[in-house]
Amino acid sequence: MTRWRVVRTSLLLALCLSLAACAGGQQTGPEVPVEVPQKVRLLAGDTKALNYTPWYIHSFALFGPSRSGIGGGGPNVMPIKANGRPSEGGGKCCTSLPAEWQPELKLTVRWLVEKKRADGKKWGYWYKAENVQIAPYSSGNTGDAWAIFLPGDRVRIMLTDGNRDGGNNPNNRPADNDPYIAQGVIDEEWNRRYPPAHD
């Protein structure tokens, strides 16, 4: 990837996230009553990623309920390694998530993936998973937030909590039947509003 392409992709992502933040306050239809989320104590920290897919992930972002203060973004991450181990995206500051696990909390996760078509050309696509639950974690010893990207356009969000034998150990690949894995779909809205670069 050329230096210009990296700069262009970074600028495009920053623009998309800025526009999405601005668009959040615009009324687009009839007024609908909204349940305001309860205020919870938040922690801020790095977000990391593991990629078990064969596709490069340019970036991703987590969105909590409106006005909750919950959300953040994550790093780019290379495709799965030839030896079957996931690639890791280093820490990116700062994501805000509840200090204590909230079972009712639902997030939206959006990510930009570079996939190859049958003709070999690379195409970027925005994906999203809605109603994503964070895997349960113990408060008091939380560490980094992790987005784990799995084959089939799936994602799992977790916080490390010091329990190396529990379900929040980034060294362990989540089981395919893990109830905290969310299915992603092509994000038609963001692909239309913020078209990714193509070869």
Predicted region positions:
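Bacterial N-terminal signal peptides that target proteins for export
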Residues: 1-11
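Short, intrinsically disordered, charge-biased short linear motifs at domain edges
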Residues: 8-9, 34-37, 77-82
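C-terminal motif of bacterial Sec signal peptides marking the signal peptidase cleavage site
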Residues: 18-21
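Bacterial signal peptide processing site
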Residues: 23-26
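Protein maturation boundaries and topogenic segments
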Residues: 29-32
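Short, surface-exposed binding/anchoring microloops in extracellular/periplasmic proteins
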Residues: 34-65
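Beta-strand-rich cores of mature extracytoplasmic or soluble domains
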Residues: 102-199
